[in-house]
Amino acid sequence: MRIVLTGGSGYIGSSLTPVLIKKYGRVYNIGRNTISEVSINGSKEYCEFTYESLFDSLVELSPDLVINLAAGYYNDSGAPDLNVIDGNLKIPFIILEYFKSCNYGRFINIGSYWEFSCSGRGVKGVNPYGIIKSTVRRLLDYYSKYNVIYTNLILYGSYGDNDHRGKIVDCIIDAVNSNETLKLSPGEQKLNLVYIDDIIEAILYIVSSDNGQYDNETLSIYTPTEHTVKEIVCFINEIKDNNLSLGGGRYRNDEVMAPDYKYRNIFHAKDKLKEYITSKIKK
């Protein structure tokens, strides 16, 4: 099976790629302007591409499966980053058009619960990132009528070793370990965070399924436990003295205060957050 990834150099992609290589030998990763071939021998450039030439590159690659991990995040400060459109919509659209032309293909899309959540301002989709990601769900339904088989996996949050994305849990841990002051919001927002290894296992489960049980379906992965930021801080307070300041900062303009669970949970992951935090806090 020839597998192509988008966003393979991101946090989830870099964790998934070695596991796929071990099982399938090699994968191809679509970056911002190059496609790389990745195997046990390392990574090498397969070709450069533009949005106009990507379709032809896919014809040459002839993938059986594409796993769409690309995520162009929205930043509401400074000049707009068009990758929020390019990564989240343009590349998936071109791939789906390619599969439509073949009258076959399998597409695993990694989505976000922000797509159907509401921000504190009452905006469904939260911000341009979530709104654009939600468009892909509607596209998947369209292309399924042209023999493109999709599985859409909704994530609620991820964490784990070697995560350099600056997510809230790691920001808190870094501040505690460096004895820095960190001003946080009042911390009432609820999080449902899944350990990276469980997410990878769930994706592999979908990749290796061959009985059609996940065909043309949107699924999700989450744990049975929600944690507020306030609860996380209180837990850390029991472990180590720190300079975390709850209420010293404000909620984000597009804050989501609680997860909304709309789709079947494919993988009943255990809540491992406290164990992870305990292992990372320097005593």
From Swiss-Prot:
Q: What is the reaction catalyzed?
A: CDP-alpha-D-abequose + NADP(+) = CDP-4-dehydro-3,6-dideoxy-alpha-D-glucose + NADPH + H(+)
- Pathway(s): Bacterial outer membrane biogenesis; LPS O-antigen biosynthesis
In its UniProt entry, the species of origin is given as Yersinia pseudotuberculosis
- Keyword Oxidoreductase listed? The answer is yes
**InterPro entries recorded:** Epimerase_deHydtase, Lipid_A_modif_metabolic_enz, NAD(P)-bd_dom_sf
GO biological process terms, semicolon-separated: O antigen biosynthetic process
Q: Which family does it belong to?
A: Belongs to the NAD(P)-dependent epimerase/dehydratase family.
A molecular function (GO) held by this record is:
oxidoreductase activity
Q: What is this protein called?
A: CDP-abequose synthase
- Where does this protein hold NAD(+)? G7, G8, S9, G10, Y11, I12, G13, E48, F49, Y129, K133
- Keywords, ordered alphabetically: Lipopolysaccharide biosynthesis, NADP, Oxidoreductase
Q: Which positions are catalytic residues?
A: Y129
Q: Its function?
A: The CDP-abequose synthase is involved in lipopolysaccharides (LPS) synthesis containing abequose which are important antigens of the cell surface responsible for the serological O specificity. Derivatives of the 3,6-dideoxyhexose group have a particular highly immunogenic character.
Give the EC number. 1.1.1.341
